[in-house]
Amino acid sequence: ARDWGAMADEVRAIHTLYSTVVGHNVLEVEGLKPKKAPAPMTVSRLDASGGDLTVDGTACYPGLKQWRRRVRWDQSQLVVEDQVAAPADKPAVMLFRWHLGTDQSAKISGEGGNWQVVWPEGTLALASSVPLTVTQEKLPDNTVCLGKKDNGWDFLHTCVVVRTVQSASSADLTTTVRAAR
């Protein structure tokens, strides 16, 4: 027999954790609800050695002046440069999540705009134009353990939460991810 209560919990999780900004490594702006909208992508380079592309997600956040993300990668690292601008008269708290794909806790160190996150499989370095708080939380996963009920919906992975300390009219954040050696 199907446990309808458990199924309702799974449906709620889809709508609150998986299909929202919480479930993705993207921008969240406190007080703004993102919407589905075109996000033009410019590919500067894409080949066997890596790539370089820029996504303009501004239209996805009504009320935001700009969100531009540049992503560059090769075999050694992934570099993500986020440029976010709010209207001068409406500064905002900006937040990013980085899903690490591990159930192991991360070691977080740093202050102000410079932070480092280390976990068994890699490192994440943050350099920001504004002060940040960096924390971690456990979130359910349905990517690493796709669809495996015994180790899927209830599998929790580590998610790093990067948040501006206070409302800002703009923030530039560079995130560099490297695999452990």
What do these predicted ranges mean?
Residues R2-R181:
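CBM-like, beta-strand-rich accessory domains located in the C-terminal region of large
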